């Protein structure tokens, strides 16, 4: 099955307004960065009548898939975008602190720290070594359940 690119490019050419015609032998050059162009008369474009008539092949002057027009438009856009300047950086949010033990984790905490010599004991006292976040988290974390999670890890990681 074909891609339909020749049909879609013909449809796009029919829908174009006179201002969007490519600069060619009968079109005026861009003046002072404006996009006004003088429309090309139909007699000056050899492939215009051939494209409109069904069953006829377009002239070899017009590309069958519109690649030249696409490349020209992309080059024009690239030239315009160079004048825009760098984009403004997005504001950054402070990182949230996450709890050390996550319920439902597939890997046992003891197994994940076996190969690390200075890792110490996995089940520390709640809140030890952690800084309080500057603002309250959207989801509150219940520190009283940490002992329960540690006992479950010990039982299932034997």
From Swiss-Prot:
Keywords from UniProt, A to Z, are: Cell membrane, Cell projection, Cilium, Cytoplasm, Cytoskeleton, Lipoprotein, Membrane, Myristate
Annotated motif Ciliary targeting motif: location in the chain? 29-33
- In which tissues does this protein get expressed? Expressed at high levels in the kidney and pancreas. Moderate expression seen in the skeletal muscle, liver and heart. A weak expression seen in the brain, lung, uterus, prostate, testis, small intestine and colon.
Query: What organism does the record attribute this protein to?
Result: Homo sapiens (Human)
Instruction: Using the UniProt annotation, give all residue ranges assigned to the region (Disordered).
Output: 1-146
The record gives the membrane topology as: Lipid-anchor
Record's subcellular location: Cell projection, Cilium membrane; Cytoplasm, Cytoskeleton, Cilium axoneme
Keyword Membrane in the entry? The reply is: yes
What GO terms fall under cellular component here? Answer: ciliary membrane; cilium; cytoskeleton; cytosol
State the protein's name.
Cystin-1
Q: Where is the composition biased (Low complexity)?
A: 19-32, 39-52
The signal peptide here is: none
As recorded in Swiss-Prot or TrEMBL, the protein's gene is named: CYS1
In this record, residues modified by a lipid of the kind N-myristoyl glycine are: 2
**Keyword Cell membrane set for record:** yes
Q: How does it assemble?
A: Interacts (when myristoylated) with UNC119 and UNC119B; interaction is required for localization to cilium.
Source organism phylogeny: Eukaryota, Metazoa, Chordata, Craniata, Vertebrata
Segments of skewed composition (Basic and acidic residues)? 65-75
Q: Which domain of life is it from?
A: Eukaryota
């Amino acid at each position: 099955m074909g891609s339909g690119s020749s049909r879609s490019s013909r449809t796009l050419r029919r829908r174009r307004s006179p201002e969007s015609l490519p600069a060619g032998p009968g079109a005026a050059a861009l003046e002072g960065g404006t996009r006004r162009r003088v429309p090309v008369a139909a007699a000056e474009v050899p492939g215009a009548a051939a494209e409109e008539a069904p069953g006829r092949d377009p002239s070899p002057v017009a590309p069958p898939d519109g690649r030249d027009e696409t490349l020209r438009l992309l080059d024009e856009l690239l030239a315009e975008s160079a004048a825009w300047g760098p984009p403004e950086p997005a504001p950054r949010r402070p990182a949230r602190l996450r709890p050390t033990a996550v319920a439902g984790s597939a890997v046992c905490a003891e197994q994940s720290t076996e190969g690390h010599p200075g890792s110490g004991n996995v089940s520390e006292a709640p809140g030890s070594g952690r800084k309080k976040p500057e603002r309250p988290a959207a989801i509150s974390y219940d520190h009283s359940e940490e002992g329960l999670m540690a006992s479950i890890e010990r039982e299932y990681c034997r």
